[in-house]
């Protein structure tokens, strides 16, 4: 884990009201693994850091995917190239990839696409065939950037791809499922694919396990800290009835 001042290197739009921000952070980029996240802090700005999945890492840069859903994310989108944030990361436990699987399906809903470019690249490097299934409310909300061997789209309004849930667009016979998106979607993933790996969202304060604000209820009882034991879990290990389902996905933790 590193804490560094990370200048903004670039910004690009990838969906309606959705952007990728690239920050210069060579040490964090070199260490980041699929499914991990970084905590960003603006000065001056909100008191607490904001968690974001590592979207990509390349050329010493860490990329994050975000949409303005509050004061902190709105201020991040107002940054100009050269403006710096305090970056803490990489944090958490990410996706486990096994070359023996042969193939893997990445299933994302909305901003749940956030951790999957880095995950797809790592999976392909491990010799896995990658199928990415991405869903959103409408075509304009679908992330325009994807990686993998094939992609399937799903929209709630039927404006692109399958008319309905991304889960229903997953082709038969795919290998291990990795999923990220709203908790209601992940609860449905747990019913269909109990052994799937899911990146969960929850409230978070410190990102280092101290504040206990990111509690994830486990099905056998007790709680984990998403920033330490997560944010990636076996889907069936989470008590989805007790995990908040109303959060707007912004990061996996």
Can you name each region flagged by the protein language model?
Residues 115, 184, 202-232:
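Local cysteine-cluster metal-coordination motifs and their immediate loop/turn environment
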Residues 217, 221-253:
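Short Fe-S-cluster ligation motifs
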Residues 43-44, 90, 219:
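Short, surface-exposed secondary-structure boundary micro-motifs
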Residues 71-203:
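FNR/FR-type flavoprotein reductase catalytic core
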Residues 1-81:
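Ferredoxin-reductase
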Residues 10, 56, 153-155, 198-200, ...:
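Structural signal for conserved beta-strand scaffold positions within catalytic alpha/beta enzyme cores
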